[in-house]
Regions:
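Short linear motifs at protein or domain termini
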Residues: 1-41, 47, 161
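Short arginine-rich
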Residues: 153-161
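Short helix-capping and inter-helix turn/linker motifs at the boundaries of alpha-helical repeat units
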Residues: 120-124
Length: 161
């Protein structure tokens, strides 16, 4: 009988992204586009995160806990996992739910920039994270913005020529 075949209700892009390791739209994005996208999204959420931190101290505590765990990371894999977690938590802390879709960019970024992350001075990254969240907690969005931009832009210096 007609209508008795297979029906697909919906596709869960989160599961597809998890399986593929990236959202299909991010497959051919250049390294500079990834950096620019991260700067735009992550610097853009900072005023919202600062405002939310004033209302909810646990946001700072969660970000600080991730950063403390980064200090204990001894392998590149663990470092990348925690660094992604930090930046994802920062975006999520904005409570701007449409931007949470951009957290896929983080996984793609760290996969593509693995060599850059290897060469980066991890302690500088940790201290940069700390300056960002401390500035946000104090309500100094401009300082946090400057630090975030420098933090992400530093990967340009390590791009292959």
């Amino acid at each position: 009988k007609p209508g008795r075949g297979l029906q697909v209700g919906s596709v869960n892009m989160d599961r597809v992204t998890e399986y593929l390791g990236f959202h299909p739209a991010l497959h051919d994005v250049s390294p500079t586009e990834l950096i620019d996208t991260r700067v735009l999204v992550e610097a853009g959420v900072l005023p919202h995160v600062a405002r939310r931190m004033q209302e909810d101290a646990s946001l700072y505590e969660r970000l600080n806990a991730i950063n403390l765990n980064l200090r204990q990371a001894r392998s590149l894999a663990r470092w990348v996992e925690l660094d992604i977690a930090f930046h994802r938590e920062l975006i999520c802390a904005s409570r701007l739910s449409p931007l949470m879709a951009f957290t896929d960019v983080l996984a793609v970024f760290f996969r593509r920039f693995r060599e850059s992350v290897k060469k980066a001075e991890w302690s500088q990254g940790i201290e940069s994270h700390q300056r960002i969240i401390d500035a946000l907690q104090a309500g100094h969005v401009g300082e946090a913005d400057q630090e975030m931009r420098a933090h992400i832009e530093s990967h340009r210096e390590r791009l292959p020529s």
